[in-house]
């Protein structure tokens, strides 16, 4: 008789994403702010298809200069409910795809992540077998939205 143990591991997909203060961009467009003064952050975000929104940490919030947001209730992965800050005014860029969104603010320097809403808005897909994020191959020339 053979016995064996199957060990399952979950691969994590990360991608280099740029976050931009949306309000700084508006000020730049209105001639009130030089392009070099637009606050940005670029780095690795975990791509989490089980999460809904973008989640940044306090360090990223401060670097982007985002204003204090509102407290909102969230459900964590373990099923517990907690209150967390939600801020607005974040532009997300992956390659030539962009979206505008709010973000949950995680404590201190917790690992940031990007959830389903920004992925859908930018028409991006996760390739789990390769731990890669890429443009939807059905729409390589730009995001396609359905209004049905």
Regions found by a protein language model. Give the residues of each.
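Pepsin/retropepsin-fold aspartyl endopeptidases
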Residues: 1-148
């Amino acid at each position: 008789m053979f016995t064996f143990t199957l060990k399952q591991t979950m691969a994590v997909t990360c991608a280099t994403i740029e976050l931009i203060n949306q309000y700084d961009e508006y000020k730049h467009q209105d001639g009130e702010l030089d392009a070099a003064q637009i606050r940005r952050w670029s780095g690795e975000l975990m791509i989490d298809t089980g999460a809904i929104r973008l989640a940044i940490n306090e360090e990223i919030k401060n670097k982007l200069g985002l204003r204090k947001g509102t407290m909102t209730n969230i459900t964590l992965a373990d099923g517990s409910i907690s209150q967390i800050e939600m801020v607005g005014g974040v532009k997300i860029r992956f390659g030539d795809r962009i979206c505008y969104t709010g973000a949950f603010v995680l404590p201190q320097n917790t690992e940031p992540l990007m959830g389903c809403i920004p992925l859908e808005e930018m028409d991006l897909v996760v390739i789990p077998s390769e731990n890669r994020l890429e443009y939807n191959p059905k729409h390589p020339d730009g995001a396609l939205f359905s209004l049905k």
